[in-house]
Amino acid sequence: MTIVLNPGKVTLSQLEAVYWNGEVSKLHHDTHFAIKKGAERIAKIAAGSEPVYGINTGFGKLASIKIDADNVVVLQRNLILSHCCGVGVPLAENIVRLMMTLKLISLGRGASGVRLELVQLLENMLANGVIPVIPEKGSVGASGDLAPLAHMAAVMMGEGEAFFQNIRMSGIAALEKAGLCPITLEAKEGLALINGTQTSTALALAGLFRGYRALCGGLLAGALTTDALMGSTAPFHPDIHILRGHYGQIVVSETLEKLVKDSGIRAAHLRDDDRVQDPYCIRCQPQVMGACFDLLIAAAKTLIIEANAVTDNPLILSDDTVVSGGNFHAEPVAFAADQIALALCEIGSISQRRIALMVDPAVSYGLPAFLAKNAGLNSGFMIAEVTAAALMSENKQMAHPASVDSTPTSANQEDHVSMACHGARRLLAMSENLFTIIGIETLVAAQGIEYRAPLKTSSLLQSVMEYLRKNIDTLKGDRYLASDLHKAHILVSEGRLLSVLSETIFPQLKPK
């Protein structure tokens, strides 16, 4: 299925489909007029004698140097090659596809001045699976994501490297195998390709999508734990949360109520329960997870605006004037990435605390130590809980805001930068850790619920338990647990446990 992009109106669900499903995208044909008009305006300037930044001048600190019309094409080529300075391992294919899609959206607004054939080459690369090799490091998030986007642009010129049919090869070889021809960049086109926030935004969107999946997985795991610990569901009463008024808290409480509804375990201890209140990691799930959801919603609002934005420089305005500005500065993306990082950290933190409760016989309300059968001879989930603690601690360190850092670059011309790119990139590592933490909690909670037999959990949670046990057996004695943790990670990270239930049970990630 091909996603047709209408720049300015692209939705979060369309971008999710690109990231999770590898959907191919192209611009709506209505964009062609604006693209052609912008290209004509730039061509006219390039043919004239008046110096205009980015069209017939140098770049950055060298902006005052006028470039002759005969060298404009050389200027663009040199720009791309000199900026291919990325280092580190290549970004994943779905990240690069998302980057390329975001660049299409930006160019499709017609304010960048590139030719239609350049845009169509980018579309054809996506359609034919030519995926540029883009090293993950090298951008400070202003003046745009220069280095990573230069690696993308290099392939369009027949330079650099690309993956084609999962094989890494030269950029020109990948184009040829796909039946495509490299393009010679004309005035401003190189700058339009690399001046933008598309790498940072793609990484932040990936973090958002993964964070939302983790949040839903955390709600499911938290509901399982609540039943495993015979916790009270009274704190999920909707009126409590309506009185406070936070949207995330309200919808999270509704989700938790749905998940534990009709639980036989809960019904068995509605009366004569000597515990007045549960620990906060059980009782305050709506408050904590709701606040995390609100952070994700806020980040989503920022990122969908940025995804539809024109972020290169200079720009062609509606009156045909060409004006230099600073839309390439990724501060909004950096802030959004920091918000997502805080949410990922807290989702993992409260999950780890629930694991700790379940493995401790002093506070687990009758569960055996470490959920082990014949504890002592068997260690059960003792070290799985330690692993969760280690991952939680890693995430705490990575949650420190990246946006508070800045360092001058480019001979002090670019003297304040956003650090959005690595601020967004760390979300991938944080979410990987978080998927494992939630996977561990799910395993421990499922074991705990089984210890409550013959009492049964809710019908919704029972369906999740049945799916889980088709993939991972109950821990009846110590075994090689790494395999279980790996399988649990996959079930959470790929959303397989969530797919057992209707998606309407969970809060919907829709920016307000």
Curated annotation (Swiss-Prot):
Q: Where is this cross-link: 5-imidazolinone (Ala-Gly)?
A: 142-144
Q: Which residues in this protein are found as 2,3-didehydroalanine (Ser)?
A: 143
Per its UniProt record, what InterPro entries does this chain match? Aromatic_Lyase (IPR001106), Fumarase/histidase_N (IPR024083), HutH (IPR005921), L-Aspartase-like (IPR008948), Phe/His_NH3-lyase_AS (IPR022313)
**PTM comment:** Contains an active site 4-methylidene-imidazol-5-one (MIO), which is formed autocatalytically by cyclization and dehydration of residues Ala-Ser-Gly.
The yes or no answer to whether the keyword 4Fe-4S is present is: no
UniProt keyword terms in alphabetical order: Cytoplasm, Histidine metabolism, Lyase
One cellular component term (GO) for this entry is: cytoplasm
Q: Which pathway does this chain act in? A: Amino-acid degradation; L-histidine degradation into L-glutamate; N-formimidoyl-L-glutamate from L-histidine: step 1/3
**Where does the protein end up?**
Cytoplasm
| The keyword Lyase appears for this protein | yes
Give the EC number(s) under which this enzyme is classified.
Answer: 4.3.1.3
Q: Which reaction does it catalyse?
A: L-histidine = trans-urocanate + NH4(+)
Q: Which GO terms describe its biological process?
A: L-histidine catabolic process to glutamate and formamide; L-histidine catabolic process to glutamate and formate
Q: Which domain of life is it from?
A: Bacteria
What is the predominant subcellular site recorded for this chain?
Answer: cytoplasm
Q: Name one GO molecular function term.
A: histidine ammonia-lyase activity
Q: Which NCBIfam families match?
A: hutH (TIGR01225), PRK09367.1 (NF006871)
Matching HAMAP family, A to Z? His_ammonia_lyase
Task: Report the sequence similarity comment from the record.
Answer: Belongs to the PAL/histidase family.
* Name of the molecule in the record: Histidine ammonia-lyase
Q: Origin organism of this chain?
A: Bartonella henselae (strain ATCC 49882 / DSM 28221 / CCUG 30454 / Houston 1) (Rochalimaea henselae)
Question: Which gene is this protein's source?
Answer: hutH
